[in-house]
Curated annotation (Swiss-Prot):
Sequence similarity: Belongs to the ProQ family.
Residue ranges, annotated region (Disordered): 105-166
Species this protein is from: Escherichia coli O8 (strain IAI1)
Keywords from the named record: Chaperone, Cytoplasm, RNA-binding
Predominant location: cytoplasm
Gene3D superfamilies linked to this entry: ProQ/FinO domain
GO MF annotations, alphabetized: RNA strand annealing activity; RNA strand-exchange activity
Regions annotated as coiled coil: none
Subcellular location: Cytoplasm
Protein's recorded name: RNA chaperone ProQ
Bias (Basic residues) ranges: 121-131
Function description: RNA chaperone with significant RNA binding, RNA strand exchange and RNA duplexing activities. May regulate ProP activity through an RNA-based, post-transcriptional mechanism.
Length: 217
């Protein structure tokens, strides 16, 4: 019997589950809420496949259910599904609220990391300190400073102008625009127009809902 290939990361396990159970897991886009107790169902269904262990399955499930796209799918009225995509009851309010808090905390962490990175870039490098002259050492005569020429003025680069998005209803799925993050604007693509704003996908692959005031062309 030939040895089966081994999946080395949780992302590879998720990709395998999305292919093995396409009506339950998804590799991209909004994810559907999973049935409570689906871990045991997975153990029973994929035991021995791809040399998967329970630890790998548990880690992959934890990564999948903590992703932004999964938390976006945990909303009022959504239905949990089993491995075959069969409905397993609606989400209760407690789980919806828990997912909302997780999503807010994740967004706050990302914003804090970006702010910290921008602050580090703005920090000036400390000036090197000159060693103090030893007592009794002769002072060297100061050299006359050469006449300094007036520095040439360098024109500051023109800031890129952006047009704010005034009406999100005029946007279309697949349209390219930018998301303002502090002083920067990141390229993004429209995925969906929702009542809370616009769901976009950044070039990094991350998808999030953004209000109109943070969108520009």
């Amino acid at each position: 019997m030939e040895n089966q290939p081994k999946l080395n990361s949780s992302k590879e396990v998720i990709a395998f589950l999305a292919e093995r159970f396409p009506h339950c897991f998804s590799a991209e886009g909004e994810a559907r809420p999973l049935k409570i107790g689906i871990f045991q169902d997975l153990v029973d269904r994929v035991a021995g496949e791809m040399n998967l262990s329970k630890t790998q399955l548990r880690s992959a499930l934890r990564l999948y259910t903590s992703s932004w796209r999964y938390l976006y799918g945990v909303k009022p009225g959504a239905t949990r599904v089993d491995l075959d995509g069969n409905p397993c009851g609606e989400l209760d309010e407690q789980h919806v609220e828990h997912a909302r808090k997780q999503l807010e905390e994740a967004k706050a962490r990302v914003q804090a990391q970006r702010a910290e990175q921008q602050a580090k870039k703005r920090e000036r490098k400390p000036r090197p300190t000159t060693p103090r002259r030893k007592e009794g050492a002769e002072r060297k005569p100061r050299a006359q400073k050469p006449v300094e020429k007036a520095p040439k003025t360098v024109k500051a680069p023109r800031e890129e102008q952006h047009t704010p998005v005034s009406d999100i209803s005029a946007l279309t799925v697949g349209q390219a625009l930018k998301v303002k993050a502090g002083q920067n604007a990141m390229d993004a693509t429209v995925l969906e127009i929702t009542k809370d704003g616009v769901r976009v996908q950044l070039n990094s692959g991350m998808s999030l809902i953004v209000r109109a005031e943070h969108l520009v062309f």
